[in-house]
């Protein structure tokens, strides 16, 4: 048989193999409703993400097809919070899907960098999470208050200097983001990045994170394409050629900071941020943990610091903007919060954590902000273990990828009410503690189970401190709220929160208060 006659045979064989694979893929989940293209390809999901409004498209899919929807050949989405304990259990066995592999920055020397939030290997996750978990517990959260107060003092000064005197319209959302990043800079490196001091995106760090997520988000829907196009030497060279080096910029910043700190520690020249308490920043703790435990991989401090820089700052800033925007758009809730803070005798200008941590309406506002616009708005993907599971009457065989989008799940009307699309903090105060607990368990904003967000409690401290500070000290009015825009590129980016600001008549001047 000559070569020419073999070619058609090979072509037929390949075609049959593809048809059989497509048939097998279709057959496994044929009982799950969903759009027809989802049976054969994930490319329509890439298209959804590229619109930057995938959360709304997925919400429409659930309205059309029900609470369980097939959105890819092997991908199922759910919208009912009832499923959360099944898909995101406290035990191991439901590993993260390859979605998260695309969120690992690529380095030529060490390949893709694993971090607590993006590793899919459960043993590795335990290895790199366990050493740092005690730093983020509720009991340890108050230890960060002094660092937050340092940055509160800075934003207080800058708002008074730049915007109080002339009553000009300014980008409040941008300054909230600056605050979140400078807080994390202080916690991680013992110094602010300089966003508040300069009023600018220092070193274009914020822009770099946006670029990184915009590049990564479409790839999350077809992870093998990410490897083929970006996570190899050839793909990486092409990315560099076209200037697609966002992850390298972030890693470069982190690597430089770690190297400088290691040198200072080895010489004994580094001084802690708060010498009275002897409190160490995150970076020093990370380095010492790795040096004192040979089981911790040498790249762990880089991974931990990378997570702080990206997830620990942008997500908190997003929740600050969401909560503040809705308070301003619904002024009766703003005044209700102000009344609670004043009635509780909260310190001014800088509220104390002990005074605000258990305030009911403040907590309801923060809970509602986290529910309304979670910082991450694509499904949190998990792989069904061998033996399969049944959710809401639908059987999912082992190997199926399943997940819920926090944006969609958090708006489940049967759980959160017919007005679930709207801001109403009072929903968290209705009925009894059992009702509130049900709502809390139904919110997917911070994840759930064994992979719940590690920095949740620290983030809530930052948010409550800042919101209380702003509400107590300033009369803020939103300008053109219709310009407030949302972009879903895995991270939920927001733009256009403009406002005017003036001192409340009874506000305390910055110079009259010591922290």
Swiss-Prot record:
<dbReference type="InterPro" id="IPR017972">
    <property type="entry name" value="Cyt_P450_CS"/>
</dbReference>
<feature type="binding site" description="axial binding residue">
    <location>
        <position position="453"/>
    </location>
    <ligand>
        <name>heme</name>
    </ligand>
</feature>
<protein>
    <recommendedName>
        <fullName>Cytochrome P450 monooxygenase mfmA</fullName>
        <ecNumber>1.-.-.-</ecNumber>
    </recommendedName>
</protein>
<dbReference type="InterPro" id="IPR001128">
    <property type="entry name" value="Cyt_P450"/>
</dbReference>
<keyword id="KW-0479">Metal-binding</keyword>
<dbReference type="InterPro" id="IPR036396">
    <property type="entry name" value="Cyt_P450_sf"/>
</dbReference>
<keyword id="KW-0349">Heme</keyword>
<dbReference type="InterPro" id="IPR002403">
    <property type="entry name" value="Cyt_P450_E_grp-IV"/>
</dbReference>
<keyword id="KW-0503">Monooxygenase</keyword>
<comment type="similarity">
    <text>Belongs to the cytochrome P450 family.</text>
</comment>
<dbReference type="Pfam" id="PF00067">
    <property type="entry name" value="p450"/>
</dbReference>
<keyword id="KW-0560">Oxidoreductase</keyword>
<dbReference type="InterPro" id="IPR050121">
    <property type="entry name" value="Cytochrome_P450_monoxygenase"/>
</dbReference>
<keyword id="KW-0408">Iron</keyword>
<comment type="pathway">
    <text>Secondary metabolite biosynthesis; terpenoid biosynthesis.</text>
</comment>
<keyword id="KW-0472">Membrane</keyword>
<keyword id="KW-0812">Transmembrane</keyword>
<comment type="function">
    <text>Cytochrome P450 monooxygenase; part of the gene cluster that mediates the biosynthesis of the phthalide-terpenoid hybrid 11'-O-desmethylfendlerol. Within the pathway, mfma and mfmC act together to convert 3,5-dimethylorsellinic acid (DMOA) into the phthalide 5,7-dihydroxy-4-(hydroxymethyl)-6-methylphthalide.</text>
</comment>
<keyword id="KW-1133">Transmembrane helix</keyword>
<feature type="transmembrane region" description="Helical">
    <location>
        <begin position="3"/>
        <end position="23"/>
    </location>
</feature>
